[in-house]
């Protein structure tokens, strides 16, 4: 008996060692499986993020079609016999619809998601351009069939305006979905400026390639076989099909990866910076833990984890929206954006008719040395180059905070001691560049010298593009990425007022000049539709130049003024 006891003890130890070995083996296997699972999940997330990035850029490359309005604006005058006021009414409808709903679109984007916006944008694009094609075709055929008497075109204006309202809202939806996906998916990286600038750049490229496609692929054929004017009907049908497909593409590919983690990080940083009181959020969580059995059972049926996550997200986003609106520096920043972008929008909308005022009617044959398509392309090239250039340059030279959330007085956002240039300085520089382009036009330097007009379209395009790239980037850096679409939407809706105001001012100036110059073709009963000379545009662009200078002053005040970003320690 005594000899068997040590044997039993030894056997027990062997069994324990084997169990321990097996447990360690199982634990090791579990750790390996867990690591492999994490790696696989990270790869899947990277693939989704990359697909969303590529899709966002493709969509942005196609959805800037509203900017090529000046390509066919002269044909609305010559073919549909619209006055300058009527042409601008159509242009203003599109511009207002592009900017005015952007705050609501941004709100939906942050709280509902990207897919509904993409689908809505695709449907509205197809409907808008389809309606515009039908209206243009019907009225054009009526004028061709009855050239001997005046056709009533009053019925067409409301329908054409409605079609461009659809196009404007669709542009807003797809643009916000594309830019927001990049802002939220790449908000942590050192090169977030480049990631955000890429879809914005593609949006700037859009009018360039679309204008060239229109003038090369969708033109009428003259009796001698040469290319004639743009075939607006076919061009509208092409845009309807292209943009509708972009909406479908975005519906299936645009996603924000790890949005829940983004919200949790935002809560933590906001509480640390003192910008947010988490007591109400904690109270909500404690109530869910202290629920009765009956409440727990009912909540389980409603999936309380999802309900709490959604409530928490909305709570944080609403708190950030209130903080954004209460920030006194936001208002001069938004007003500066309005005063800069308004003149830029009015310029591109009226580019075609401006070119027509530069050359005397008796030299009409020589006017083909420059065209609206050429300058839409020049505007597009400089617009695009400045967007991608400013995104890259600010990543390399501008200071950057080590956070993707709202910057507060206590935010720990250390910055390197390397040489840096503030993004505000870049914004002021490019706004001044835009004002120089407007000044050249206002001064009459290009009058009777249409070959010099590239200076105007190039400078305005470069300034306009840089401002549109820097503004959303500064919104993400100062006020965070999680509520980006809402915050940027509140600022982005303001240019609707600027575009409308300057469009009306230009129309009044142009029409007044037309009444004086009587520059229409001889024997025409439409002499008052066309204008030639500095009086057609100079007063408008002198005023626009001054407003851009005022905007630069507002930017500098928001940066260096009392209670400005510099005094508050905000890295920008």
Swiss-Prot record:
Keywords: Glycoprotein, Membrane, Transmembrane, Transmembrane helix, Transport, Vacuole. Glycans are attached at residues 30, 515. GO terms for cellular component: fungal-type vacuole membrane. It is a multi-pass membrane protein. GO terms for molecular function: transmembrane transporter activity. Pfam families: MFS_1. The chain crosses the membrane at residues 50-70, 89-109, 116-136, 159-179, 193-213, 232-252, 335-355, 426-446, 459-479, 488-508, 539-559. The keyword Transmembrane applies. Residues 1-39 are annotated as: Disordered. Residues 1-29 have a biased composition (Polar residues). InterPro entries: MFS (IPR011701), MFS_trans_sf (IPR036259). It is found in: Vacuole membrane. The keyword Kinase does not apply. Probable transporter. Belongs to the major facilitator superfamily. This is Probable transporter MCH1. It comes from Gibberella zeae (strain ATCC MYA-4620 / CBS 123657 / FGSC 9075 / NRRL 31084 / PH-1) (Wheat head blight fungus).
